[in-house]
């Protein structure tokens, strides 16, 4: 309930008081949803992969649409892009840097993967980021990028990393 750094104590919801020498708060992480309201995820056009239920929702939606936009070219984004491509979907990946899997692999391997995925049919947009979106009554969205480029898509998967799960401190 409360943390008192001065006297190194914390209390719970029953006002029990606990003292500590060192306090580690490990609340984990949550997906970076790029500031998109969770109501948009509930409408069923935006997706993010965190658990089995998310995976089932993504799988169902992929079977219903033709155009898929993935924001983020990390492991999850590339894996879902590959799956969608195998199902003959039109896939575009938006990445705010010039590499895929930039935090995990070398630039040379990244270039090789970009070439491989491009030859397979995946379209890449590099050095641009998600800015906003507009949707119509047919569930077609205009994804608006940082340079105001617009991309039409029926489904958007956000795989743009994670952020601290700081709900405890709100």
Model-identified regions with their sequence ranges:
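A conserved short coil-to-beta-strand element within the FAD-binding core of flavoproteins
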Residues: 1-8, 126-139
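A short helix-to-beta-strand connector/capping loop
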Residues: 6, 42-44, 89, 119-123, ...
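Short glycine-/acidic-enriched loop or helix-start segments at secondary-structure transitions
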Residues: 34-36, 80-81, 103, 135, ...
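Rossmann-like dinucleotide-binding cores of NAD(P)H-dependent redox enzymes
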Residues: 67, 75-133
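Short low-complexity, flexible loop/linker segments enriched in glycine and/or proline
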Residues: 63, 107-110, 140-142
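Glycine-rich Rossmann-fold phosphate-binding loop(s) that bind the pyrophosphate
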Residues: 50-51, 71-76
């Amino acid at each position: 309930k409360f943390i008192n750094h001065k006297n190194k104590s914390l209390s719970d919801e029953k006002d029990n008081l606990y003292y500590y020498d060192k306090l580690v708060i490990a609340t984990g992480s949550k997906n970076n949803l790029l500031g998109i309201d969770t109501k948009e995820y509930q409408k069923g056009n935006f997706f993010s992969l965190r658990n089995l239920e998310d995976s089932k929702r993504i799988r169902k939606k992929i079977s219903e649409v033709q155009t898929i936009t993935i924001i983020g070219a990390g492991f999850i984004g590339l894996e879902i892009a590959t799956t969608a491509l195998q199902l003959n979907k039109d896939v575009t990946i938006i990445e705010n840097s010039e590499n895929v899997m930039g935090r995990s692999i070398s630039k040379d391997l990244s270039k090789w993967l970009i070439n491989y995925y491009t030859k397979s049919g995946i379209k890449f947009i590099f050095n641009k980021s998600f800015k906003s979106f507009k949707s119509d009554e047919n569930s077609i969205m205009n994804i608006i990028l940082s340079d105001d480029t617009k991309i039409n898509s029926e489904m958007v998967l956000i795989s743009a990393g994670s952020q601290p799960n700081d709900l405890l401190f709100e």
